[in-house]
Amino acid sequence: MEGGAAACPEKGIIMQTLVIGFPRIGTLRELKFASEKYFRGEIGAQELLQTAAQLRKIHWSTQRNAGIDYISSNDFSFYDMTLDTAVLLNIIPKRYKELELSGLDTYFAMARGYQGASGDVKALAMKKWFNTNYHYIVPEVEDDTVIQLSGNKLVDEYAEAKALGIETKPVVIGAYTMLRLCRFTGKKPALDYVEDIISAYQNLVKKCEENQIAWVQFDEPSLVLDMDDSDKALFHQIYDELLAVETDTKVLLQTYFGDIR
C-alpha cells in the first residue's frame, strides 16, 4: 500500500492524500477463500458478491478513518484490474462469449479457463506486471472486437461507497496503457483501435459526470517506460481528445514504478 502526506508550514500548504493500490484480498484472505469455495461449488454467486461488498466496505472505512482525502473505488477486483478494464471496454474474445455463461462466470473463464457443460476453453495468457511479481491477465483484441464502454461496475461501486457516506474517486487503467497491454490477435494493429478506445473513455468520463462523480483516476504506468516519438504522439492524441470533452468531472492521471519518460 502506498500513499502519503506532506506539509509546508512556511507556506501554509498541506498536501492531500490518496492510496495507490489498496490491498483487496482482506486481512484474513477472505476474498481468496470465498473465491475458492465458489470455484468448488460450495457457495453461490450471491454469497461471493456479499463477501466482496463487505471487503469493500472495510477498505473504504479504513481509509476514511485514517483521514485519506481521495479514497478510491473500482479498485476492487475478483482477479485482476486489467481484466476488469477489458470487460469494461467490451474486450471479450468470442470463445468466451460463446460459452453463454453469466457475466461473473465469463469473467472467471477468461481468468482461469472453463471446462464444463458449456464448452472447454483455456484462460487468457498472463504476463508480469511491469517486471513485478504480480501477473496480469493479457486482454485479447480480435479483428471484430468493438471497443466500447460496457457494464456498470465503475459507477455501481461508486454508488455503493456513496450509500455508506463515503465519497470516492473511481480508478481505471488508462487508455494508453490498455493499448500497450493488449494482445492484438488478428490482422488489425493497435492503431486501428485508437479512436474507438478514445470514444470509450470519453463516454466513461461523461458517465461519471452523469453520476455526479467529481474525480476519476486513470492509471498510466506505461508512461514510465521508454517512449519514442510515435508513443508520445499517441499519448497526446488520446488525452488531447479525451480532455477536450466538456465535463465537470476532473481527471487525475496516476503513474507508478518510475519517472515519466
Predicted features, each with a name:
Residues 3-4, 12:
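Residue-identity detector for glycine
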Residues 11-261:
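Domain-level signal for soluble alpha/beta catalytic cores
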